[in-house]
Design a protein with these regions (language model features):
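NUDIX/MutT-family hydrolases
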Residues: 92, 101-132
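Conserved Nudix-box catalytic region and its N-terminal flanking loop in Nudix hydrolases
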Residues: 23-62
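Active-site-adjacent beta-strand/loop module that shapes the phosphate/pyrophosphate-binding cleft
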Residues: 67-69, 77-99, 109
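Hydrophobic packing within well-folded, soluble alpha/beta domains
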Residues: 52-61, 73, 91, 108
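Conserved hydrophobic "DFG−1" position in protein kinase catalytic cores
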Residues: 18-19, 26, 93-95, 110
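Conserved N-terminal beta-strand and adjoining loop/helix that marks the start
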Residues: 2-24, 45, 76
Length: 132
């Protein structure tokens, strides 16, 4: 059965650009998920009646089991393909604690900005790296 995409009302998605010293946290998507094994800045969908920052805090706690400090929004990008229609909202963040436990990703890496080109990013996230 073909999945229908609502092109009029994209879904808001938030992503955390988590920085520690000169490194950024990248997460490798689960192999069984859409765009599996690609790298991304972690985050997820904004739920009804949730602010972007509330959604980002919740998603990072669910996915990485850590709390974050959220600073400024640095970018917004729209992405649409045959499966999804989203507006991605990117925020600079830092970890409050470093006891990361993965629940939805295959792996994480701390990566220097100049090494981003070595990673196969999900669409959208790769474009944002030039703004960091």
């Amino acid at each position: 059965m073909k999945k229908l995409i609502n092109t009029l009302n994209p879904t808001d998605v938030v992503a955390a650009i988590i920085k520690k010293d000169d490194f950024y946290l990248l997460a490798k998507r689960n192999k069984d998920k859409y765009m599996g094994l690609k790298w991304e800045f972690p985050g997820g969908k904004v739920e009804e009646n949730e602010t972007f920052k509330e959604a980002l805090s919740r998603e990072i706690l669910e996915e990485l089991s850590v709390n974050i400090d959220i600073y400024n929004k640095i970018a917004e990008e729209r992405y649409q393909d045959s499966e999804i229609n989203v507006i991605l909202h990117y925020f600079i963040c830092s970890l409050k604690n470093e006891d990361i436990v993965l629940s939805e990703h295959e792996a994480i890496n701390w990566v220097k900005k100049e090494d981003f080109n070595k990673y196969d990013f999900v669409p959208g996230d790769g474009d944002i790296t030039s703004l960091i």
